[in-house]
From Swiss-Prot:
<comment type="similarity">
    <text>Belongs to the class-I aminoacyl-tRNA synthetase family. TyrS type 1 subfamily.</text>
</comment>
<dbReference type="InterPro" id="IPR054608">
    <property type="entry name" value="SYY-like_C"/>
</dbReference>
<feature type="short sequence motif" description="'HIGH' region">
    <location>
        <begin position="38"/>
        <end position="47"/>
    </location>
</feature>
<keyword id="KW-0030">Aminoacyl-tRNA synthetase</keyword>
<keyword id="KW-0648">Protein biosynthesis</keyword>
<dbReference type="InterPro" id="IPR024088">
    <property type="entry name" value="Tyr-tRNA-ligase_bac-type"/>
</dbReference>
<dbReference type="InterPro" id="IPR001412">
    <property type="entry name" value="aa-tRNA-synth_I_CS"/>
</dbReference>
<dbReference type="GO" id="GO:0005524">
    <property type="term" value="F:ATP binding"/>
</dbReference>
<feature type="short sequence motif" description="'KMSKS' region">
    <location>
        <begin position="222"/>
        <end position="226"/>
    </location>
</feature>
<dbReference type="GO" id="GO:0006437">
    <property type="term" value="P:tyrosyl-tRNA aminoacylation"/>
</dbReference>
<keyword id="KW-0963">Cytoplasm</keyword>
<dbReference type="Pfam" id="PF00579">
    <property type="entry name" value="tRNA-synt_1b"/>
</dbReference>
<feature type="binding site">
    <location>
        <position position="33"/>
    </location>
    <ligand>
        <name>L-tyrosine</name>
    </ligand>
</feature>
<dbReference type="InterPro" id="IPR024107">
    <property type="entry name" value="Tyr-tRNA-ligase_bac_1"/>
</dbReference>
<keyword id="KW-0694">RNA-binding</keyword>
<feature type="domain" description="S4 RNA-binding">
    <location>
        <begin position="347"/>
        <end position="411"/>
    </location>
</feature>
<keyword id="KW-0067">ATP-binding</keyword>
Length: 411
């Protein structure tokens, strides 16, 4: 099997610019890259989709590179964004670069900073050497540009595709990168790079663009920094492994096949066996547990997965006796759960509203009527006073509904 066949079977391949050219490429002499702009302190689960696909290319013998957007991150990609990005200052970009570089290297990827492509190039050289390669009418015709042009598109963002295109040309010439991989929203920028290569190298070039489907929520909206991915960072200090585990565990059966195909490094046949067992008895959530376990371990490591599983058992296994937990256990759990400070004798509902865990008195009454607010598995009333009886009175578990768990910490 080849990599394209694998991606097709996994239902993640979106587009490829030229299948014939790709078929003639030799993995051992072909580089593949994905670009990651340092527009935040961490990558998120949506980015991890591309990391995982890049690692699949690596498994098939390709040379793989992650191009860190030290230059492009200072400009901002306008592709399918509703409004102008807020430009980051140099200090923020450099801070983000350092953290994201470490994340990418933790997956065994070679990281290249595209700032090095431009740092010694002045504006006149850029206009002569890069701008000359692309026609303005061609740039204007891009769907990503057309969607923004009526709402306002700065020249800065308009030129982003020139930078990404030149990245492809530069890596093609210097590193033997013949394949640029990206999410489906990057198609226009990738094709710009191929056109640049064609003008410089000629029609017999070997450059190919490959795009894959974007990770979206159940409503079909892309999961990114500003659309939900911000809650799913792959930095455990920004998103706990427990939270990531719970997110994946909560995925609906209607999406689980797609997510397993995309995220899991098991073969399609092995995944199908898991799905068959799961749908024979969906209440076991076998497929969701398989997905959550593999992704959390791949991103955060085996120890963090073990901790996430243990906390899940503590919080959601009705047969588990929480009273056996020690204060040391609670101090660890505090790193994984939303924590609400509260004093002995304080009103529970007032404290929850103040800390925005409950929206209003009305919402509180609705949950109380449904018997869906509990402290240490005991139902509370609207006028309940905080008086914990477990863990030496220093902690208590608060549950809102079936899934939201908060740790009360006595202050």
């Amino acid at each position: 099997m080849n990599i394209l066949k694998d991606l097709e079977e996994r239902l993640i391949l979106k587009d490829i610019s030229n299948k014939d050219k790709f078929a003639n490429l030799s993995p051992s002499t072909t580089g593949v890259y994905v670009g990651f702009d340092p527009t935040a302190e961490s990558l998120h689960l949506g980015n991890y989709i591309l990391i995982s696909v890049l690692l699949r290319f690596k498994e098939y013998g390709f040379k793989t590179y992650a191009v860190l957007g030290g230059a492009t991150g200072m400009i901002g990609d306008p592709s399918f964004k509703d409004s102008e990005r807020v430009l980051l200052d140099n200090e923020s970009v450099n801070k983000n670069k350092s953290k994201i570089k470490a994340q990418l290297e933790s997956f065994g990827l070679e990281v290249i900073d595209n700032y090095d492509f431009y740092k010694d190039m002045n504006v006149l050289e850029f206009l002569r050497n890069v701008g000359k390669l692309v026609n303005v009418s061609y740039m204007m015709a891009k769907e990503s540009v057309q969607k923004r042009i009526q709402k306002g598109l700065s020249f800065t963002e308009f030129t982003y595709q020139l930078l990404q295109g030149f990245d492809f040309l530069k890596t093609y010439q210097e590193l033997g990168v013949k394949v640029q991989l990206g999410g489906s929203d990057q198609w226009g920028n990738i094709v710009t790079g191929i056109d640049m290569i064609s003008k410089v190298v000629g029609d017999k070039h070997e450059a190919v663009g490959v795009t894959v489907n974007l990770l979206s929520d159940e409503n079909g909206k892309k999961i990114g920094k500003s659309t939900g991915g911000g809650a799913l960072w792959i930095d455990k200090n920004m998103c706990s492994p427990f939270k990531m585990y719970q997110y994946l565990l909560s995925q609906k059966d209607s999406r689980i096949k797609e997510l397993l195909y995309w995220f899991s490094f098991k073969s399609v046949s092995e995944i199908n066996e898991v799905l068959e067992k799961h749908f024979a008895n969906p209440s076991t959530q076998e497929a969701q547990r398989f997905l959550a376990s593999e992704v959390v371990e791949n991103i955060f490591g085996a120890n963090e997965l073990k901790q996430a599983k243990n906390i899940t058992k503590i919080l959601f296994d009705k047969s588990f006796d929480a009273s056996v937990l020690t204060l040391n256990d609670l101090e660890i759990i505090e790193n994984y759960l939303p924590t609400c400070p509260i004093r002995q004798g304080d009103s529970v509902i007032e404290t929850l509203i103040k800390n925005k865990f409950i929206v209003s008195n009305r919402e509180a009454r609705e949950f109380i009527q449904a018997k869906a607010l509990k402290i240490d598995n005991k139902e509370i009333e609207f006028d309940s006073i905080y008086s914990p009886s477990l863990f030496e009175g220093k902690y208590a578990f608060f549950k809102k509904g079936k899934k939201q768990v908060i740790l009360f910490k006595t202050v």
